[in-house]
UniProtKB/Swiss-Prot annotation:
Additional facts recorded: Present with 57500 molecules/cell in log phase SD medium.
Encoding gene per record: RPL31B
Matching Gene3D superfamilies: 3.10.440.10
A GO biological process held by the record: cytoplasmic translation
Protein's recorded name: Large ribosomal subunit protein eL31B
Keyword Nucleus recorded: no
Keywords: Cytoplasm, Ribonucleoprotein, Ribosomal protein
Amino acid sequence: MAGLKDVVTREYTINLHKRLHGVSFKKRAPRAVKEIKKFAKLHMGTEDVRLAPELNQAIWKRGVKGVEYRLRLRISRKRNEEEDAKNPLFSYVEPVLVASAKGLQTVVVEEDA
């Protein structure tokens, strides 16, 4: 899998409404965090997924049961610089502020490094 070796950043729209359907009110925000980690793991192919504090605030801003229907996410696959790291790559997930997340496509973001 040569595709997993590169460092890449993409923007996704995740539909949390369908992933949280049927989840009891007091477990919706914690389940949203788990579902975002699962989504990033699936799309980036990394076991190590880290969430930005801003993303956590975006999930929880309307309380435990008022999670947004859709969130726009920027997921970056980066190299792990720690010497004793189990995985060579990790994913970093942060929110993207948009007026409406409806109808947006997945795009590759060019990094200015």
